[in-house]
């Protein structure tokens, strides 16, 4: 299983960016993506940026990684706050919703 880590760009240079989180900063290869700007979020795997992220998606991934650490540490109480969006019904993307038959008036 591959796990990408969201890191925020602190400084840019040609083909690389200094990126960090709350623990460390390190230089990341950015040649696989459009050149980032300071403040951007990147999904990083094996020292290379694989995609640019918006701040909300970066936070979701960070929460999921924190949840994994909490489970490993046996702290199950921490999970509720880390997966706050799991109490909602999943939504199909619009192109799949269009393929569903119309709902009956009395159906949920």
Swiss-Prot record:
NCBIfam families: hypC_hupF
Taxonomy, superkingdom: Bacteria
Organism: Azotobacter chroococcum mcd 1
Protein name: Hydrogenase expression/formation protein HupN
Region listing for Disordered, in residue ranges: 88-108
Pfam family, one: HupF_HypC
GO biological process, one term: protein maturation
Gene3D superfamilies the record matches: 2.30.30.140
Family recorded in the similarity comment: Belongs to the HupF/HypC family.
SUPFAM superfamilies documented for this protein: HupF/HypC-like (SSF159127)
GO molecular function list: carbon dioxide binding; iron ion binding
Record gene name: hupN
């Amino acid at each position: 299983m591959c796990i990408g880590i969201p890191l925020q760009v602190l400084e840019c240079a040609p083909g690389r960016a200094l990126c960090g989180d709350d623990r460390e900063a390190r230089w990341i290869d950015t040649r696989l993506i459009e050149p980032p700007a300071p403040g951007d979020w990147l999904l990083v795997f094996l020292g290379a940026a694989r995609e640019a992220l918006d701040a909300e998606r970066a936070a979701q991934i960070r929460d999921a990684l924190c949840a994994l650490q909490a489970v490993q540490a046996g702290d199950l109480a921490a999970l509720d706050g880390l997966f706050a969006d799991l109490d909602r019904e999943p939504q199909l993307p619009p192109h799949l919703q269009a393929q569903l038959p119309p709902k009956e008036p009395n159906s949920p």
